[in-house]
A protein has these predicted regions:
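NAD(P)H-binding glycine-rich loop region in Rossmannoid oxidoreductase-like domains
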Residues: 1-45, 54-59
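Conserved catalytic-site region of short-chain dehydrogenase/reductase
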Residues: 50-65, 79, 106-110
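NAD(P)-dependent short-chain dehydrogenase/reductase
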Residues: 89-135, 139-141, 148
Length: 221
């Protein structure tokens, strides 16, 4: 694709493995920051749509702390979140026309890196604490929303792209009717993700985490 041109470039590249970012920060920088520069400077486009993550927020414990315009303390970010934040800043600096979408937890056809997948496969154990709270969104809904926002002619904005609610990992058992086992280390750390969706909710009807999980679960049958 380098050296070519297009009307809209949707960039969903970069490292998606948080543990690898912490183990190999240089690798993560090249994968999530340097790589985006290659595309921005070597492809001619009219609009750049960047797929980012809610991990750019230094505090996700309340919806007031995950508003798109909140001041982010980069010193509190882990390596993964900091590099994703740097990538966003690069887009904002070099792209005259952009959209940035910060995604929550992903489920969708073909995806295997999530707790629901681990729930239904007996050879796997869930690595997240049952008390961890996550906002799940289906990849199908993500694509539909991005194209809808683009069609509205909205430019140079950041959106949290997430479902309207957060659930606990322990709730998944009741949602899909499947019990699971947890790894020993799963209980050591409890995460709490409360994502503000007020801004994007003005333009779309938000789905729920339960709907996202059920659709994904049915696709795996």
């Amino acid at each position: 694709f380098l050296g070519k041109s297009c009307d809209t470039l949707i960039y969903a590249n970069g490292n998606a493995l948080k543990y690898k970012a912490n183990e190999e920060p240089l690798f993560d920088f090249h994968a999530s920051v340097a790589s985006i520069a290659e595309y921005i400077h070597n492809i001619k486009f009219k609009k750049f749509i960047h797929i980012s993550t809610i991990d750019v927020y230094d505090n996700k414990t309340s919806i007031m702390k995950t508003k798109e315009d909140v001041n982010i303390d980069t010193n509190k970010l882990n390596i993964y979140g900091y590099h994703k934040y740097c990538a966003e800043e690069y887009v904002k600096h070099f792209c005259d026309n952009y959209l940035i979408f910060r995604l929550s937890g992903l489920v969708g056809k073909g995806l295997k890196k999530n707790a629901i997948y681990d729930f239904i496969h007996k050879n796997k154990k869930v690595m997240l604490s049952p008390e961890t709270s996550i906002n799940y969104i289906n990849t199908r809904f993500i694509a539909e929303t991005i194209f809808h926002i683009q069609d509205l002619g909205i430019d140079n904005q950041i959106f949290n792209l997430a479902s309207k609610n957060t659930i606990k990992i322990s709730d998944i058992e009741n949602i899909i009717g499947v019990k699971t086992e947890y790894t020993k280390d799963a209980y050591l750390y409890v995460d709490n993700n409360q994502i503000n969706t007020e801004k994007i909710g003005k333009y779309i009807k938000l789905s729920s985490s339960e709907e996202a999980i059920i659709e994904y679960f049915n696709s795996l049958k």
